[in-house]
Amino acid sequence: MTRVINLDGESLTIEDVIAIARQGVACHIDDSAIEAVNASRKIVDDIVSEKRVVYGVTTGFGSLCNVSISPEDTVQLQENLIRTHASGFGDPLPEDAVRAIMLIRINSLVKGYSGIRLSTIEKLLELLNKGVHPYIPEKGSLGASGDLAPLAHMVLPMLGLGKAYYKGELLSGQEALDKAGIDKISLAAKEGLALINGTTVLTAVGALATYDAIQLLKLSDLAGALSLEVHNGITSPFEENLHTIRPQSGQLATARNIRNLLEGSQNTTVATQSRVQDPYTLRCMPQIHGASKDSIAYVKSKVDIEINSVTDNPIICKDGHVISGGNFHGEPMAQPFDFLGIAISEIGNVSERRVERLVNSQLSKLPSFLVKYPGLNSGFMITQYACASLASENKVLAHPASVDSIPSCENQEDFVSMGTTAARKAFEILKNSRRIVATEIMAACQALDLKPENHELGKGTKVAYDLFRKEVNFIEHDKHIEIYDELNKASAVIEDPSFLEAVEQAVELSIQF
């Protein structure tokens, strides 16, 4: 039976977002939402017919809020809004981000506080389910008043305007609708504002980054465990007794993950008089990785709220009362997404240091740069440089966007969140850190193959090693390989959900205790 996710404005999960955005799962407006949507729309119709002054319905926008709009111009006002606010720059957002944007906007609208017609919401839903993906430039949002520019680009194809992708082809908005068998619409009063005024873009991009960060945290524990196998790591720093007396949830979870991954390993060791303790990047994984786990768990809790929230303005209350407020302001998510970037950056940073330990013959006691006949061969020399470059780039990207603001709209919108920048930066940091972690796994597997004695790996590390080696080759020497290809294979392996799923079938991994 084909899976369909019902949207009621209350119960959307981050896993649902992934299913619809990346796996093409269909969605449907839950029957429970229809009455509230219709009631909200009737209130807007009454406002127009009674010529009441309500922001964005019978007035202009932003600093033009005191300009009255006649009832006969309220429809043109909404189309003008979309045409002029679609002012984004840069490359288009990827398909999964666009689908997440469409989904989260629909889920917000079905709560029934935006005064939009049910048929208009259903039109956006039809585009989503039929795979018409608006061309949305990635830059141009201040994160307050919501994500106006990118969301206006989302709306254009609904009107037969702008550009959209359909079956991988970039078309005019009208042509995309025609090929998908979708009729264009005209907007009614308030509908343009209802579609574009909200934190939807920053929330969608940040939600994808948060989900991927959760997977990366588990992969980073796996990478660290493989490095411990190479270095014959001391296991006492991961004993439960050590962490229960400092019961930070992420720390406890990391220590347990490492224990589970290394269960049965014949490579790990205990402290001796000649070797009392390992360096921080190995010994302090629970504390370092755990701190990032706690930060990302907090971010996820904020995402869970935001994807089920109304971020429109004005709000049409159930009793007919209209409130002009600030739910569109992105600050509640801008700060968490800055935390997200910092947390992921630390994971990339510590992983790069472990890559250095693997390729450094003085630290690993293996051939320099993990290749036979170093000198004639350079092996992983520049691979470590590349990881260092990414880690250093992350340190620049991790500077918070939310500490900045710039006044706009004739100083009416005088403090903005820059939350969309925070979310986009977090995703860039995620991609960089994922590359570094993939390289650590690749280097650790190479190092294990170079060790003079092949001892049994742990319960989880063995599964990971075997799967990884099916796709990524051992590098014998430089002559017949292009290491770039192997690095890309390594990244592809860990980005494939089936890799981590297979490891988790063997051992339990979590980010919270």
Swiss-Prot record:
Keywords, sorted A to Z: Cytoplasm, Histidine metabolism, Lyase
Enzyme class: lyase
Enzyme Commission (EC) number: 4.3.1.3
Sites of the 5-imidazolinone (Ala-Gly) crosslink: 144-146
PROSITE patterns named in the record: PAL_HISTIDASE
Biological process according to GO: L-histidine catabolic process to glutamate and formamide; L-histidine catabolic process to glutamate and formate
Pathway: Amino-acid degradation; L-histidine degradation into L-glutamate; N-formimidoyl-L-glutamate from L-histidine: step 1/3
Catalytic activity: L-histidine = trans-urocanate + NH4(+)
SS bonds (residue pairs): none
InterPro entries documented for this protein: Aromatic_Lyase, Fumarase/histidase_N, HutH, L-Aspartase-like, Phe/His_NH3-lyase_AS
Localization in the cell: Cytoplasm
Name the UniProt record assigns to this protein: Histidine ammonia-lyase
Primary gene name: hutH
